[in-house]
A protein has these predicted regions:
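One-carbon transfer enzymes
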Residues: 1-226, 258-260, 271-274, 280, ...
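Short, intrinsically disordered/low-complexity patches at protein termini
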Residues: 125, 163, 232, 240-243, ...
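Short acidic-hydrophobic surface loop/beta-edge motif
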Residues: 208, 230-234, 264-268
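Short, solvent-exposed recognition patches
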Residues: 210, 234-251
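A sequence-level detector of short linear motifs
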Residues: 240, 274-275
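Low-complexity, glycine/alanine/valine/leucine- and proline-rich hydrophobic stretches
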Residues: 245-273, 282
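A short, acidic, flexible beta-alpha connecting loop/helix-capping segment that sits on the rim
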Residues: 279-283, 297-298
Length: 304
């Protein structure tokens, strides 16, 4: 088939690379977001240009010139590999078989742009990914295929994405294309009664509330590690918190009840969190032991 690959960042680049390596389909063009001044060039653009592929970077898909250029490609399918901008029906339906889109959750659960963060924050033990046929709703189109993963108690946003969803998503990209090529691909209507939606997981969402349970605090820290990064305050300054563990402790919520080479033990509503790695407001990520030494931290200090 003649494919348009639409995507961005590392996942889009790796999906394009996998399609080219398989060598069964012709990539006729690559679409990615416009360049931003002062920002690195998107890796999918760099890779596509290295391979001699046409690259398009429309700021919208409504202008007639962009739509005409897409029609001229005579594509059979558009593969949307990590796309966070809205692509209207007029553009989606230009390829003979339309467009398929990757989403990192088991739809209809966790529609929205931060669909890996929120399941971890909520304490979920399973998640996955979906390829679906996008419509004008947000992640509401018919389902083509789904793949499931386990979320372990030690998983973070980083491990779930880079070690599980990312590689499985690349495999699923090739499988999704093959399903369309084979004819009569699945189109399973999402059960809207099961749908959930969450917006971006932003800095405000990542502030630690030490008055919550140890489980809730622990899940927030790992569900925002590395981005956007959970945080608290110390002496009025922001302190980001990364690697941690649940421990037994007693004290008022937010109180530093112990400091050691292992880290900083902070009391919660029903126990404690051993903070192992932090990022001060004026520096890089460091071990908690280094932070203890840097600021002469002692038990009795209250975070937050």
């Amino acid at each position: 088939m003649r494919l348009i690959v639409m995507g961005q960042q590392a996942f889009g680049k790796s999906a394009l690379e996998a399609i080219l390596e398989k060598g069964e389909d012709e990539v006729v063009a690559v679409y990615c977001a416009p360049d931003k001044e002062g920002k690195p060039v998107d890796p999918i653009k760099t890779f596509a240009e290295e391979k001699g592929l046409p690259v398009y970077q429309p700021d919208n898909f409504k202008d007639a010139e962009y739509l005409d250029a897409m029609r001229a490609l005579n594509a059979d399918l558009c593969v949307m590999a990590y796309v966070i901008i809205f692509v209207p029906e007029e553009a989606r339906d230009i390829p003979t078989h339309g467009s398929i889109c990757f989403h990192p959750s088991i739809l209809p659960k966790h529609r929205g742009p931060s669909s890996i963060n929120w399941p971890i924050i909520g304490g979920a033990t399973k998640s996955g990914l979906t390829f679906f046929w996008p419509d004008d709703g947000l992640d509401e189109g018919e389902i083509l295929l789904q793949k499931h993963i386990d979320i372990t108690p030690d998983d973070t946003l980083g491990t779930v994405y880079f070690e599980k969803i990312f590689p499985l998503g690349i495999e699923a990209t090739l499988e999704a294309i093959a399903l369309v090529k084979a004819g009569n691909p699945p189109r399973i209507v999402q059960d809207s009664s099961l749908a959930t939606y969450e917006s971006w997981c932003r800095k405000a969402d990542a502030e630690i509330d030490w008055f919550k349970s140890s489980a809730d605090v622990y899940n927030l820290i790992r569900g925002t590690n590395p981005q956007p990064g959970s945080w608290t305050t110390h002496d009025g300054n922001e302190l980001k918190v990364f690697d941690c563990a649940k421990v037994e402790a007693s004290g008022k919520p937010g109180e530093v009840v112990a400091v050691s080479d292992e880290g900083i033990t902070v009391a919660t509503k029903d126990g404690g969190i051993l903070v192992k790695r932090v990022k001060p407001h004026d520096g890089k990520k460091i071990t908690s032991a280094d932070y203890i030494s840097k600021v002469s931290l002692t038990a009795g200090v209250v975070f937050g």
